[in-house]
A protein has these predicted regions:
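Hot-dog-fold acyl-thioester-processing enzymes
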Residues: 2-72, 119-121, 126-206, 253-256
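HotDog/MaoC-like acyl-thioester-processing domains
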Residues: 2-10, 21, 73-161, 212-219, ...
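Generic structural motif
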Residues: 90-92, 168, 208, 223-224
Length: 256
């Protein structure tokens, strides 16, 4: 099994659901384009599931036209990799609220299994649909989602450190990775780390967190690497995202 240095700083908590409050589930299966050559589901594909079920939940609640949501941070903890064509129940629920943001938990549970193969938690920023500026949650949104975690207040503060003395490698974001917001979709930011994973044997498990900063456009970027940390930066040095590997996660081999 491969390993790499890991960080032991604070990661977003994986909060269990309460007995009350809204939960939303969809059946899902990893397809051909979701999986690595060995058959496991890739992290960028898992991130795609997270955003898809988040929107499906908002739409099902009748709130899709109230606001736009953009992801600020996501932690993905893989206990067992989902594999090609397996069937899963993907369940999501709100696990915390802030004034202009909310935290959403998602569990990916294989058919016939009791515990999740994957646990994830994301921080989403609440934006108005015209100017795309942060705005306070509406009474209707709080009524729909507040019951899941009415007393758990969360912060939108980012935690990952800035780069210092890191190795650098080129990366290219493509125009085909733009989404309807006209910037690189959040799932694509996982691809540089996934490319490292694909250089060797698949890790059995992983626990990794990404923070999104300045939205990226297509073009050449740099991926900085220092132990358990990765940073995706633009040509002018602006930071687009940072990645940290938690605990004792296996991962890519050290850079040669």
């Amino acid at each position: 099994m491969r390993s790499l240095p890991t960080v032991h700083t604070e990661f977003s908590e994986l909060v269990a659901p309460t007995k009350r409050g809204r939960r939303f589930m969809l059946p899902m299966r990893p397809g051909f384009s979701d999986c690595a050559p060995g058959g496991r589901m890739r992290l960028d594909a898992i991130a795609g599931w997270l955003q898809d079920i988040a929107y499906a939940d908002v739409e099902d609640a009748g709130l899709a036209q109230v606001a736009a949501w953009v992801v600020r941070r996501t932690r993905i903890r893989v206990h067992r990799w989902p594999r090609f064509s397996e069937r899963f129940a993907v369940t999501t629920y709100v696990s915390g609220l802030g004034r202009m943001w909310a935290e959403r938990r998602t569990d990916i549970v294989r058919d016939g299994a009791g515990a999740p193969d994957v646990e994830a938690v994301s921080l989403w920023i609440h934006l108005d649909r015209i100017e795309w500026h942060p705005t306070t949650l509406t009474d209707g949104e709080i009524a729909a989602y507040g019951g899941a975690a009415p007393e758990r207040r969360i912060s939108a503060r980012l935690r990952h450190p800035p780069p210092a003395g890191a190795e650098s490698a080129a990366w290219m974001f493509r125009a085909t990775e733009l989404d309807i917001a006209a910037h690189i979709n959040n799932a694509a930011y996982w691809q540089p780390f996934e490319q490292e994973l694909l250089t060797g044997d698949d890790p059995e498990q992983i626990d990794v967190e990404i923070e999104y900063r300045k939205p990226a456009l297509p073009g050449e970027k740099q991926v900085l690497r220092d132990g358990p940390h990765r940073w995706i930066v633009g040509e002018g040095g602006e930071m687009h995202a940072s990645i940290a590997v938690a605990g004792d996660s296996p991962g890519p081999p050290p850079a040669s």
